[in-house]
UniProtKB/Swiss-Prot annotation:
Description of what induces expression: By fungal elicitor. Induced by the bacterial pathogens Pseudomonas syringae pv pisi and Xanthomonas campestris pv alfalfae.
Protein name, entry field: Isoflavone reductase
Residue numbers binding NADP(+): G11, P12, T13, G14, A15, I16, G17, R36, K44, R148
Record's function text: Reduces achiral isoflavones to chiral isoflavanones during the biosynthesis of chiral pterocarpan phytoalexins. The reduction product is a third isomer, which represents the penultimate intermediate in the synthesis of the phytoalexin (-)-medicarpin, the major phytoalexin in Alfalfa.
Organism: Medicago sativa (Alfalfa)
Gene giving rise to this polypeptide: IFR
InterPro entries, sorted: NAD(P)-bd_dom_sf (IPR036291), NmrA-like (IPR008030), NmrA-type/Isoflavone_red_sf (IPR050608), PCBER-like (IPR045312)
Residues annotated as the enzyme's active site: K144 (proton acceptor)
Documented EC number(s): 1.3.1.45
Catalytic activity: (3R)-vestitone + NADP(+) = 2'-hydroxyformononetin + NADPH + 2 H(+)
Family: Belongs to the NmrA-type oxidoreductase family. Isoflavone reductase subfamily.
Length: 318
């Protein structure tokens, strides 16, 4: 669906930003990316490196070859940020968890520029107005919720993108710590394994984000990505994998009490990942009814989008 909407991605070389850039180019949008002069930090702790192997430098080269318009700047440089925003119609922030509160600077720049049709703040997870998460992720979700309130108070046009569980974080290893591939012998399951979760590939997040960006119906609404074939319990996910490898895994179920204890006693990234897994697999933070007045279910709004199913995704690991 080609469109003349000019889209600016902030955080274009991050785990999800890269996929939004690629989806924007594929959709035919004039695509802009704000990049800093500084090289990527190879020592920066990452949650799942295997899901995003490209370096910043490789991505920049790739973007140039695709025709992405690279703008030099930084969200901490108000003047260059305003200048970049004035060139586009839609701003999508894909900054990482450590920069959530810095989005007030983007909001200020958008207000000054005065031309933005829609702002997507950095969310790309569960709905931060509907969760029972624990620390250390709770603070991040609360920061995202506070940014929502600032956006609304300032009258900035917005779309919130709630995509829940990236396959690169939750599915490629069946939510097991210290491995990047699905287990073939034993598997640990948090809770009873019967709580529904919502899985989506990072590439499909990019696709749905750009569809939502180009859709006028998403103005001042939240878009929820809960794809029918990927709305699965952990037990269902494991059953898919067992069928593929022709083997039944030895299962260990961990109580919520023990999970909370493990979170408190672990360091990053284990505590963060466990808290994310706890949110989806035990508390069921992907299970809720949407309000049509302010919510849009992506699979219903864009039924023509062909997405990667959890079953298909796991084929690469057989």
């Amino acid at each position: 669906m080609a469109t003349e909407n000019k889209i600016l991605i902030l955080g274009p070389t991050g785990a999800i930003g890269r996929h939004i850039v690629w989806a924007s180019i594929k959709a035919g949008n004039p695509t802009y990316a704000l990049v800093r002069k500084t090289p990527g930090n190879v020592n920066k702790p990452k949650l799942i490196t295997a899901a995003n192997p490209e370096t910043k430098e490789e991505l920049i080269d790739n973007y140039q070859s695709l025709g992405v318009i690279l703008l030099e700047g930084d969200i901490n440089d108000h003047e260059t940020l305003v200048k970049a925003i004035k060139q586009v119609d839609i701003v999508i922030c894909a900054a990482g968890r450590l920069l959530i509160e810095d989005q007030v600077k983007i909001i200020k720049a958008i207000k000054e520029a005065g031309n933005v049709k829609k702002f997507f703040p950095s969310e790309f997870g569960l709905d931060v107005d509907r969760h029972e998460a624990v620390e250390p992720v709770r603070q991040v979700f609360e920061e995202k919720a506070s940014i929502r309130r600032v956006i609304e108070a300032e009258g900035v046009p917005y779309t919130y993108l709630c995509c829940h569980a990236f396959t690169g974080y939750f599915l490629r290893n069946l939510a097991q710590l210290d491995t990047t591939d699905p287990p073939r012998d034993k598997v640990v399951i948090l809770g009873d394994g019967n709580v529904k979760g919502a899985y989506v590939t990072e590439a499909d997040v990019g696709t749905f984000t750009i569809r939502a960006a180009n859709d006028p119906n998403t103005l001042n609404k939240a878009v929820h990505i809960r794809l029918p074939e990927n709305y699965l319990t952990q037990n269902e996910v494991i059953a898919l994998w067992e069928k593929k490898i022709g083997k039944t895994l030895e299962k260990t179920y961990v109580s919520e009490e023990q999970v909370l204890k493990d979170i408190q006693e672990s360091s990053f990234p284990h505590n963060y990942l466990l808290a994310l897994y706890h949110s989806q697999q035990i508390k069921g933070d992907a299970v809720y009814e949407i309000d049509p007045a302010k919510d849009i279910e992506a699979s219903e709004a864009y039924p023509d989008v062909t997405y990667t199913t959890a079953d298909e995704y796991l084929n690469q690991f057989v």
